[in-house]
Amino acid sequence: RLFKAYSQSASTLNLLRAFSHGGFADLKKVHTWNLGYIKKSPQAKKFKDLEDKIADALAFMDACGINSEFNRRLKTVNFWTSHEALHLPFEESMTRIDSTTGEYHATSAHFVWIGDRTRQLDGGHVEYCRGIENPIGIKCGPTSKPDEIVKICNLINPKNEKGKITLISRFGHDSVEKYLPKLIRGVKKEGVNVIWSCDPMHGNTIQSTTGYKTRRFNNVLKEVKDVFAVHQSEGTYAGGLHIEMTGQNVTECTGGAKNI
């Protein structure tokens, strides 16, 4: 399974490179991007209006001589990959030494994270991540304690470099206000440099009557809104969202634009 996953990942990355630098990412093509999921949605008109505004802005820029023909930044985009550094033997096999600096780098992804269940201070996942130069994410759920998270940050990032550590909160839609403020205050008190991110997916998993795991879209959205509200009140910034995606149109979440 690992060999198959590796092969599929390599193929996906090759496709991303082709799309991101072959002209498909050109903003002029915004009308041709995958719109199948939105066409029959009540939100279709809003999406179309946004497309039209982007097209109008690009037309104005073109009239000013700013276009993708002379500015590659308008037709290309950089992709950075990320995954959980869960399977340590696999991660070890993908770790390389920079011959110019002697530093270790994980080449399985640009950014790797430690899961909420594997962030033990004396665990192998923290030990591995503290030995590589990649930016590192740390999942923080309801069981996380501020002092514990600070210790992990200091262990992985002893120089307190900005941008090295991202704390990814995953408390669930009904627990953000209970846990996140304490975590933010604990980290700020110790002067630890972190980027704050929100994972509204993994804390909101429920089991349907058929036995399948699913999520309610409204719960996902509520966690995102609560996280932004807490950061605003604490004087910090939500620096990103951790969202699960799929290459196919599947119905995993209930609710949403079509109120499934």
What are these regions (language model features)?
Residues 169-248:
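Extended C-terminal subregions enriched in glycine
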